[in-house]
Structures are given as C-alpha cells and as structure tokens.
Amino acid sequence: MEQLKTIGRELAMGSQGGFGQSKEFLDLVKSIGEARSKAEEDRIVLSEVDILKRRLLEPDIPKRKMKEYIIRLVYIEMLGHDASFGYIYAVKMTHDDNLLLKRTGYLAVTLFLNEDHDLIILIVNTIQKDLRSDNYLVVCAALNAICRLINEETIPAVLPQVVELLNHQKEAVRKKAIMALHRFHRKSPSSVSHLVSNFRKRLCDNDPGVMGATLCPLFDLISEDVNSYKDLVSSFVSILKQVTERRLPKSYDYHQMPAPFIQIKLLKIMALLGSGDKNASDIMSMVLGDLFRKCDSSTNIGNAILYECIRCISCILPNPKLLEAAADAISKFLKSDSHNLKYMGIDGLGRLIKISPDIAEQHQLAVIDCLEDPDDTLKRKTFELLYKMTKSSNVEVIVDRMIDYMISINDNHYKTEIASRCVELAEQFAPSNQWFIQIMNKVFEHAGDLVNIKVAHNLMRLIAEGFGEDDDDADSKLRLSAVESYLQLISEPKLPSLFLQVISWVLGEYGTADGKYSASYISGKLCDVADAYSSDETVKGYAVSALMKIYAFEIASGRKVDVLPECQSLIEELLASHSTDLQQRAYELQALLALDARAVETILPLDASCEDIEVDKDLSFLNGYIQQAIESGAQPYISERERSGMFETTDYHPQDHHEVPTHALRFEAYELPKPSVPPQASNELVPVPEPSYYSESHQPISTSLVSERESSEIKLRLDGVKQKWGRPSYQSTTAASSTTPQAANGISTHSDAGVGSSSSKPRSSYEPKKPEIDPEKQRLAASLFGGSSSRTDKRSSSGGHKPAKGTANKTATVPKENQTPVQPPPDLLDFGEPTATTATAMDPFKELEGLMDSSSQDGGSSDVMGLYSDAAPVTTTTSVDSLLSELSDSSKGNSRTYQPQTSKGPNTKEALEKDALVRQMGVNPTSQNPTLFKDLLG
Amino acid sequence: MGIRFILMVNKQGQTRLAQYYEWLTLEERRALEGEIVRKCLARNDQQCSFVEHRNYKIVYRRYASLFFMVGVDDDENELAILEFIHLLVETMDKHFGNVCELDIMFHLEKAHFMLEEMVMNGCIVETSKANILSPIQLMDKAH
C-alpha cells in the first residue's frame, strides 16, 4: 500500500543549497536508504569503510570533497561502525577558514569524540582562536564545540574568553557563552563558582533567547542551593507573567502559546523555590492561578503547561484555590480519551495525593481503567500511583495486582523494580504473616533472581520467629503452611536459586517438625533439589545442611535413621566435591550420623535457629583444662605475636582467637561456626555477650560460596562436628563451651538492619482479609480507595466525559481565534505568520495524529489519505495541502499535478527540478524503500 | 540533565540521525537504539507516546515512516518533549520544505546544526524557528 502511495510521487527534495554532493554520496545514501535489513546495511557500511580508508589517503583532496568524506564518516558511526581511522580528518577540518567546513568539522568531532579523547588537545587551540573571530558564527561554532568537548582540565584554557563573550553584542553568542558556562559548572562547579553572578545578570538580558537559556543553569544552581536564590522569586514570577501576557516576540510562540518552553522552565524553577516556603508560594499563587485560567487545554502544549503547573503546585505550599484548580486539571486529563493525557493525569494524581490524599477517590474508576489498560506505559504509571497510595487497608489488592503484573512482564529492569516494591509494601503493611509468606513466595518464584538477598533472610527469620511471644500454635501453623507451600512448589522446574535456598532452609528446620511429613519424604525432596540444581553450589550447600538437620532431629528423637540411597550417593559425591565448602558439609553430615542421640541434640537442637549464640571470645571455660595441662607438664602457650614480635603475622594464625581476624582469609570460615552452638535446649552455658560478632558473620553468608555462607542457620549447630574437622584446639573448645546455656532465648542481638525492622512489622497486626478477588471494577475500586462506587457511577462518569470531550474539541478553535486579535503586533523575525492564522482553525495536532493513525494502518490507507486531504491544514508554518493532495494523486497515477493552493508554490517547482536532478543521479522513487520520500508532516 | 539523546529512526529500525548528550560507546548506542526501536514499533497509535526504558523515559512521535525519539530523565515533562519534537519537525519542514526522510539523509549535517541551536547541554535553549534557522541560512547564502 505504502509503495502504491509513493510510487510516482514527486521527490520533494531539500529546497536548500543545491546538490553539492557527488554521485558517490548520493549512491551511498540511496543504498543505505534502500537497505532492507541490518545485515545489508552493515555490508554497505563496511564497504564504505574500505572506500573511505583509501580515499582519505589520496593527496590533495579538495575541501568540498573532504567535507563529504567527513559526513560519510558520520554515517559510518551513526550506523554502528567504527570510523576512528578518520577522526583526525575531522579534527583537521575544524581548522578550516570556511565557516561551513569548520562547522561540519566541529560537528563531526563532537559526534566522534568524548571529552577525554586524546585528539581534543589538538582542537583546544582552534577553539581559542575561533572564540576571537570577528565572525560571530565562527564564535558560535566554537562555543558549541566547547559545550561538548571541554573537560575539567581544559576549562581554564577557554574560560576567560567565554566570560568575555557573555557581553558580546550578538545575542546568539551571549546565549551560547552562558551555556558554555553552564557546562563548566556541571563539569567542575568550583571552576566557575566565582562567576555565578553572571547567570543572574543574563537573566535580565534584553534578548529573550538569552534569558530563556539562562534559566537552564539557574535551574541547576537553584536545585543545589535554594536559599541563595530566594530573592529571585519575584523576578521569575514577573518574567512568567510577562511571557503569559505575550510580551515576548511572536517568533517564540508555539501553536499560539507564548514561549511555552520558557514558561515550563520557569515553572520548574518556581517549584524549587516555593517548596516549603509559604512566602514564595504566596507570591506565585497569582500567576499560577492565571495560568490555570488561561491555558488552552485543547492543545498538547497547553496541557504541557497545565501539567507543569500541577507539578509546581504539588511542590509548593499552595492555597486551597490552586489545589482545586490543579485537581480540576487532573480530572480533565483523566477524562480525556488521549492516553498521553491520561498518563499525565495519573502522574499528577500521584503528585497531588501527597498533599490532598482524598483526591484520588473521585477518580477511582478512571484509575482502574488505566490500570487495566493494555498500554504498558499507562499501566506502570498507574502502579506507581497505587504504590504511593498504599495503606494497610488496600495493600492486599494492590500487591496482588502488582504481582500479577510482575509475572506477566519480561523486562528485568522493571521486574526488579516492581518486585522490590511488592516486598517493600508487604513488609510495611502486611496484614498477616501468612499473607506475607504467600507474597514472598510469589515474588521469589517469579523474580527470585532479581530480589535482594536480604529479602530471603527476612523471610527465613519471619518463619523462624513467627508471631513471637506467646502464640506457639499459630507459629507452628505458619511454619506448616510454609512447608506445605514449599513442598508444592519444589518440583516446579527452574526455581530461582535464592528461593531454593529459602525452601531448603525451611524444610530443614521445619519439614518434619509437625510430624506430618516423614524424614525420608523431606530428605528425598531435598536430594531432588540438590540433584536438579547440581551446578548451584549454594543451593546444594543449603540442601545438605537441611538434610543434616532432618537427620539430627530424627536421631535426637530416638528414631532410627535410614539414609535414602539417593542421599547416600549425594553425600558420597559431595565428599569428593571440588568445593571445600560442600565437602566439609558432607563430612560433617557423615560424622553426625555416627553420633548418639544426646550428642546430636546438643549439636543441632530442635527449632533453635533464633537462639542467640553467645561467644566466649576469651575461651575462659578452657582455663581449667589448660591449668590441668600445665600442671601435668605442658608448655604454656606463647602467642605468635609474642614469639615473633611481629604484629602483622598474628592475624594469620588461628591460634590467636582473641581477635577475630579482619582479613577475609579462610580462617574466618572456620571460626564462624563457633558462635553457633546454640543452646536453647540444653542448659549449661556461660554466655558472653557478643552481638557484633554475630552480625559480622551473618552478612557474608549469602553473598559468597565460602563455607560461612550458611552461617545464619548452620552457624548455630555445626560446632559439635567442627571440632573434628576444624583446628583442634580452637574448635573443640568452642563446642564444649558453647553448651553453656543461658537465657539466650528471645533476646535478639541481631544487628542485621533490614531484617529486624521488617520482620517486626508484619507481626503487629492481623486484620481479617476482605474478599477482594472480585472481578468487578467497583469492587476493586472500593478495595483500593476504600470508597464505595457502583456501576452506575461508572456509566454516568464515562457518559459525562464523552460529550465534554466533544465540546472541548469544538471550543478549542474558538478561543484561539479570540486570542489572535489580542496579540501584540508581530515582532520581527516571525516567519510563521501567514500560515499561522489559517492553522488556528484546527488543532494541528489532532490532524497530525489522525494522519499518523492512517499511515500506520496498512489496509486501505490510501483511501484514508484521500479523506485527509480535505482536512489538510496541518502544520502552522507549512502547508501540507500539497503533500496530501500529492499523495492522493499519486495513488491514482504517476503523473504530477500542480496544486494551485499550495502556499509553497516555488518550492514545489524547485522540488520538481531537484527531482529531475536526483533521478538523473539514479535515485529513483520507485525503488525499494519508497517511504524515504514521504513527507514527514504529510 | 533533561534530554539525554535524540534519535530519528525509520520503521525498518534504521538510524537516520543520532545525537547523544551523554557519552555512550558505539556498542552501547547500537544496543540502545535497537532496544528502543523494538519497543516503540511494538506500540500502536492509541497508546501513550511515552515508554520507559531502563532508566530513560522515551518520548516518541511518528511522522510518516520516521520515528523521532527523545530520551529524557524521569522528571522531564513528557508532553513538552512531545511538542519539542514537533517543533523540530516544523523547523526542518520550514527549512527543507515538505521535509522527508531523504532530506535528513542528504542533509544530515544541517539537521544536526538545527539541533545544535535548539539543544545544548541537554537543555532546550532555543525555540524560535527564526533564530534556529538563521545561522544555517547565513551559511547557505555564503556558499
């Protein structure tokens, strides 16, 4: 279809400058334009690389030719290939006296080089020279280059000249000099800290372009230090007022809106200045109110300004009237049919909800519509809003929705974000532990590889600590439900590693606790896990430790342990593992199986993961033993430090247990288990408070494969075994010692930050769940917003806004025309005038978007184009009549007809000539990629 | 920082103009452009003209076969950027007359010159078409 439309269409080639380009260049562009695949394009570019490499070495290349080569280099890089072989030629071209060539050279250099490239040094000199030029365009070109190429080191080389140029008589130079200073400020604030007053000065520049540009650096400065600029509040307000009163030249108008981009920048600055400042906010309120009244909400640009006003109001301390106006604007956005406006509305809602929490309620149905919209962007924005308005009454609905969405997307970046939001909300507002575990399971199952490892530890801790204080029954229920859910999930293929770690841990701790599942059943499952994820050593380690716990509990309770054959073979395999960690675990397990019930119970007491382990660093409990040994003739121990007199070595010697080595050597791993032997069940310990030790060991667990990784659980119980495998003197003693009991229970000394805070919260409240899985929107609305709404509400509201929309469209044209006469006499430089008035009759955007619709649909689009040719006045400045009629013509035949009403008569003619020229050169519109010739605005 | 990059890419995913306001290596650019184009192409005209991509927000607008895509920071006013794109197209149209994809290809440097006038340091600094085009016209005259 597209081809049909374009075949025979005239080439509307550039009207400017003629075709200086060579046939070769035209051919290159043509072939790139016609390339049908990336591979084809790559081939073209690669052969172009070869050609240019040769050409550039030729002697005496004419300048024009050279310029063309440079552009071809730009093409090569733009299409993703390396053109570094030609950089030097671009650098050379910046030296040229000819302005066009110089500027092309600068352009290429800024595209090719980053600010730290070695070649830049060759350009600084040229820049310095150009800054002194009499031709202001040369100065501008140099300033452009400065904004891209000058880094911290080279700032001093050009700074004095740039400062001088701030007073240049040409406004274009002043503007660019300001931006150069802006760049310096970004690169190295200290280099221009003595010059910031210049930005204030330029704010009063009598050229609006300079003033507008100055707002950019001022915005940066003010965001860094609001208080130093409070005196400018009234200046900004007055500038904004003047802009809205159309005091700027008309050439800054955009779609009848006076200097909208300057207005937006001003509003951004005002938001900064008015934040938390009642006084400043009051000064602004007048002009903001005016903006709300004046802004034409039928154009995109008008809405852009309205949206910026909403943002501003959400930052400052607004009066109730402004809030109301903002709320009104938001509701208009939300009621619009345009997704863009809905998006802005949702965003605005999210901002305003901070100051007036009730505002969301009246828009609940619109919000839900957006949430259910297939448009991903809108959906995400809505989730952001929901995230902001989550409270304990609606957390279940919101998090459920988020999780469903999380499951449905593939984008890891966003998945991570939404997963962490789910976790955050669940931790903050969870109505019950049960629910929390469910949510965590889902998060782990579907995004386990993306969430922070702390989350896993939180979950384990929650399951271990349960509801806390008195409700043991509920605790075991919770654990059973966790175990059950894991047994269900465990056979799912490809679970994330982190989740498997949690599962293994919980199964090890509580798998058999309830008596519902047999040890062999659980251990079989654990073997399956170790087997299925045999490449994941962490998971295997967790699984083996879990097995050990299961067997320990069995032995301790006096039952006979039958090690399943698969477990046996797993253990044997791990005994020979390359991972010393796994090997150690396997040996420990093997050793444990040989111990008697009493010993095992001491090593791994039941459900003792939360017990605090007190470590007697001084090993005072050994005193008696040592005393005995010395008495029987042993040499007293002399520490390494004392022996050698060297400090450094000490840390490397395990014997020196008075200091936990800070080095990350293996020794640490051996020491870790020491704190564990936890006592809850047995009762003869001498605890020494040692909180920091605990936390120290707690952290690294997860992150590495080192054997300490599992310390959170295992640390508690390995010691008994450890004495056999660890360093004898040290380990054995710990084991013996740590059988010391004390009221360690319940006193939590963990300093692991994230864990503590989160696990305590969900515990606090258990609210009965509301049934919320009702598919109906109003139900959803009710659960989200807490308000009630009915179907009829919905209908009336949507019925209400459709007509409103229609009228909005109609009225759109009216006020515009009203406005035109009010405009001040056109200022110089306004080229857009003649057509602007005709364009007022229609919203150019509506038209354009309509066109875009039509061109995107493949079937029957030519007819649609025909239709649109009636409604042609599309752009303000250019008539598109010609294009559209050309389009419809072309669909009928290949002949060209002049369109008398085109405002671009001469251009069309010119285009025709160029067409002929281009055809001669071999660029033919009938070729493979006809869309090349399609007018962008058409 | 505001605007992080401006891309013009056609429906086939071929880059027609690329201007980055922060440094990315060739490979990064290639990958980024590919991902963005795929995302935008998958969307229909009723959907928002905004897409989130990594830590960028892409505001895009389609004219005939050509997508104009502007990568911005999260706190940028999307609607304003959308209109900025249109201003750019209008400006090019004013200069080239009935601007089409091929105009940009044949006059790549001029399209860049216009952008150089409009955007510096990732900020919109000039929005008057007359001011944007006057240096280019002067250069044309001189040749």
Swiss-Prot record, chain A:
A biological process term (GO) from this entry: vesicle-mediated transport
Q: What residue spans carry the Polar residues bias annotation? A: 694-706, 808-821, 892-906
Q: Where are the transmembrane segments?
A: none
What are the alphabetically sorted keywords of the record? Coated pit, Golgi apparatus, Membrane, Protein transport, Repeat, Transport
Q: Which domain of life is it from?
A: Eukaryota
Q: Where is this region: Disordered?
A: 690-712, 725-867, 880-912, 919-938
Per UniProt, the ranges with Low complexity bias are 728-744, 853-863, 880-891
Signal peptide bounds: none
Q: Where is the composition biased (Basic and acidic residues)?
A: 764-779
Locations listed in the record = Golgi apparatus, trans-Golgi network; Membrane, Coated pit
A Gene Ontology CC term for this entry?
Golgi apparatus
* Subunit description: Adaptor protein complex 4 (AP-4) is a heterotetramer composed of two large adaptins (epsilon-type subunit and beta-type subunit), a medium adaptin (mu-type subunit) and a small adaptin (sigma-type subunit).
Q: What family does the Swiss-Prot or TrEMBL record give for this protein?
A: Belongs to the adaptor complexes large subunit family.
- What does the function comment of this entry state? Subunit of novel type of clathrin- or non-clathrin-associated protein coat involved in targeting proteins from the trans-Golgi network (TGN) to the endosomal-lysosomal system.
This chain belongs to the protein called AP-4 complex subunit epsilon
From Swiss-Prot, chain B:
Sequence similarity: Belongs to the adaptor complexes small subunit family.
Native source species: Arabidopsis thaliana
Its main localization is Golgi
Q: Which domain of life is it from?
A: Eukaryota
Origin organism lineage? Eukaryota, Viridiplantae, Streptophyta, Embryophyta, Tracheophyta
Query: Which residues belong to the signal peptide in this entry?
Result: none
- Name the record gives this protein: AP-4 complex subunit sigma
A GO CC term?
Answer: clathrin-coated pit
Q: A Gene Ontology biological process annotation?
A: protein transport
| Keywords, sorted A to Z | Coated pit, Golgi apparatus, Membrane, Protein transport, Transport
Pfam families in alphabetical order: Clat_adaptor_s
Q: What does this protein do?
A: Subunit of novel type of clathrin- or non-clathrin-associated protein coat involved in targeting proteins from the trans-Golgi network (TGN) to the endosomal-lysosomal system.
Point out the coiled-coil segments of this chain.
none
Among InterPro entries, the record links this protein to:
AP_complex_ssu, AP_mu_sigma_su, Longin-like_dom_sf
Oligomeric state and partners? Adaptor protein complex 4 (AP-4) is a heterotetramer composed of two large adaptins (epsilon-type subunit and beta-type subunit), a medium adaptin (mu-type subunit) and a small adaptin (sigma-type subunit). Interacts with EHD2.
Q: Where in the cell is it found?
A: Golgi apparatus, trans-Golgi network; Membrane, Coated pit
